[in-house]
Amino acid sequence: MLSKNIEKALNNQIKIEAESSQIYLAMACWAEVKGLEGVAGFMYDQSNEERDHMLKLIKFVNERGGHAQISELAAPNVTFTSFKEMFEKLFEHEVFVSNSINELVHITLQEKDYATHNFLQWYVSEQIEEEAMARTILDKINLIGDDKGGLYLFDRDIQQLTVSTASTEDPQ
């Protein structure tokens, strides 16, 4: 059984994961309109992944005797000055999500809810991967600079990142 405090914190994380999905979806739309098909595909895949994270939390809350809440979402930013800015925003958001997960883990330890703590370890690991991937992408973007050929290759190569990442993901 979940305490009301942990249930509230998990419901907040459900909202954050849903907003993350919307953020990636908005980024996918922006990239697609700009002709960055590889980036758009990457963002669509990330949006779906964030939705899966949300669903995993929803099921956990409900299975543990809580009531998962679906709440109103903040509208994501839909325009960016450059694809570099878009990925900078992505990285900032992933750091925000990591901090939120860490706070949630802290609450579970304070309340001695070791089952929820154990469940959240998957999210901790996932966020390490998400931040590392965003940082790697930003490093590549910084290497490219204003080179149009580099942007073309990046757009093509990010599809490989999506394929290789998908093959190593947890199937839950």
Predicted regions located by residue number:
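Iron-associated oxidoreductase/ferritin-like identity signal
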Residues: M1-Q172
